[in-house]
Amino acid sequence: MSLNLDGMVIPKHVALILDGNGRWAKKRGLPRTMGHKEGCVTVEKTVETAARLGIEYLTVYGFSTENWNRSADEVGALMQLFRYYMVRLLKVAKANNVRVKMIGDRTRFDQDIVEGINKLERETKDNTGLTFVIAVNYGGRDEITRAVKRLAKDCASGRLDPETVTESTVASYLDTAGMPDPDLLIRTSGELRLSNYLLWQVAYTEFYITDCLWPDFNEDELKQAIIAYNKRDRRFGGVK
């Protein structure tokens, strides 16, 4: 029987670190690429569940700036999987009224992948349900570096007075501009680190770590995280 969330506060924005695809495959004597494929299936199911539960923003760490350091074969397989997954995701998004947004530096991808990303965003931009955000070629430090460069150029050109720069100004230059910061960050596979993910945005985010490997993540795992979130006393640096 599925867990009951009656009376619970549903976090507006949930961020996910999808860890454990490779270990999931290794445990079953399968190549790592099979773990990534199964992980994509879990992403689809999680998008549908999040939309149904009333979560407004779901952000997943799809491919980090550091992932380029993996073997050429694995990176190539991930790019092929990304191409395939974008086609499937468009169908899932349209069926569930989901708006898709990509964050990260897309300039390193092949042109057909960039065009696929643009198509996903363009054809779902008017959907009014869940906003599904995928971080691709993304790193928190890289995001902040790119934001600072743009901000510095605007200051140098006179378009921005450096004395007026606030935290909100900096946030407006980030990839996530216009989005609320995550309320809840879930990391699978039991690892206790951020892995260069949303470093600015998670300043006051509640963390939930589960030993579950990402391909095994399901609706009850998500609900367990929401239940744990409801037991937290969010102070945002203050005292209650």
Predicted regions and their residues:
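Flexible, compositionally biased loop and terminal segments
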Residues: M1-K240
